[in-house]
């Protein structure tokens, strides 16, 4: 079991503290993403603690645990360990398989609220009904449709598709295939791939023989996506890529840079008022606001804090009852950097509508309605456009 447990403490001994868990894959395929995501969540905790308005001036302790992202059993053990620390709620998990495993073992959760910044939702909906789970990461159903819209907008007539042979890849390719066929785009081939192979030259050769104006890669960058891009470029098979959200991280830009100038992708996110507010908060905290899922991580943490205030208690059941209350209308809109305002309004019995960095709104099933950004690549920077 690869597991770690460590603390970031935002309190003075004069005040009571509330523990909130952060259950991310700090080791494994997304280990380059999760540290900044955790720091972003902790920005919200720090903001609430500094306000001195949370309940009776209580402070937040964040308790981090490593879910690995690849080992469901390790994720379950990490969840048990973090819950044994008496956390009031959890920000996490992130990866689909680990989240499914944790949610399916209801005895682990003991009715504790989990808010995931990233775990895609369709295959988790049935499990959510048994537990208290919300996902700020928008669903693969919407993601596949957005990616199809981008493909059409780029005037791609024929496309080859390769997807990961896991739940994420299977769910996404089903939606994407249906959506692009309705747009009249010809699919030259659909190929699945095993994760984390060292060599994907045979898969790329198959894609090349089928042809196409571009290749859509529906998988994870750290679990084969990087190697597929590299093999495509090295062989001259493709130089234009349509990439799903899990292909996006800074390493992608650092490795390939201008070689992606013809390519496009999507991630969940927003360029609206909330995003601008979050950029200022993140910049002050030394965090890159354009990094994947940092806005969602801040929002997940903020919702837990506001739900505590709305219910007047850090009791687990009280938090669960108040997530929808603080995230959806009606109420005064609250943006990043305005948690003190939100806490004050709630203390006075007023209603709030937490808009956050990512236009937070949930269905009754706990699914994010969400918004998306189209990505283009310019050197080692992402260029974003609201979809």
Language-model segments: residues:
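Extracytosolic ligand-binding ectodomains
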Residues: 6, 15-387
